[in-house]
Amino acid sequence: MAQEMIEGINPTRMELLKLKQREKLAVKGYSLLKEKRNALIMEFFNILERVKGSREKVEEHLKEAFSDLTEAQVLMGDTAVERAAMSVRESVEVDIDSRSIMGVVVPVVDARATQRTVVERGYGLVDTSVKLDEAARKFEESLALIIELGEIEKTIRLLAGEIESTKRRVNALEHIIIPRLKNTVKYIEMRLEEMERENFVRLKMIKKSMEME
């Protein structure tokens, strides 16, 4: 593959200058893409470390929430808990924004609105238990953590895709484009040198022929 050249190139000085400029730009682009790839990989693993912690938090909060819910059912009865649950506002609003990581647009989700006061939840205070309030709070916290985890996992997928794309471009420059440019430049330089030698010999022969006349 390293011996391949760019096809359809005329061995002229103008073409040589153009190819050298292309080679220079390709080498610079290769260097910049390598820096981008390395920075993306570093960011990828930094974010990946957060995933395990986020999942553990979600599991812990859900476990506590279900424990409180079970206690509330024992204290209030299943029917009262279901009635309270039916009166809670179902829809939850979140703010979704975005940010850029090395040119990769990733989501930023603000899930603070998932956590509400007892009044905002909508169920009555007279016939409910404190344990139900605690269960509701922990479920809301769990929801916020789940949304945060989704944001992290989406970011990881987007970064992984960009890393793979950047790797392919780096490999193409390193193993195909730059070697072909270098080989073509070398070929043109050799051809120009040959043409100069041929012209020199031709001129020498013409001069000798003229001197013999």
Curated annotation (Swiss-Prot):
Q: Which residues form a coiled coil?
A: none
Determine if S-adenosyl-L-methionine is one of this entry's keywords: no
* Single Gene Ontology MF annotation: ATP binding
* Pfam families, sorted: ATP-synt_D
Q: Where in the cell is it found?
A: Cell membrane
Membrane topology value: Peripheral membrane protein
An individual GO BP term: proton motive force-driven plasma membrane ATP synthesis
Q: Which UniProt keywords apply?
A: ATP synthesis, Cell membrane, Hydrogen ion transport, Ion transport, Membrane, Transport
Q: Which family does it belong to?
A: Belongs to the V-ATPase D subunit family.
Role played = Component of the A-type ATP synthase that produces ATP from ADP in the presence of a proton gradient across the membrane.
- Record-given protein name: A-type ATP synthase subunit D
User: What is the originating organism of this protein?
Assistant: Methanothermobacter thermautotrophicus (strain ATCC 29096 / DSM 1053 / JCM 10044 / NBRC 100330 / Delta H)
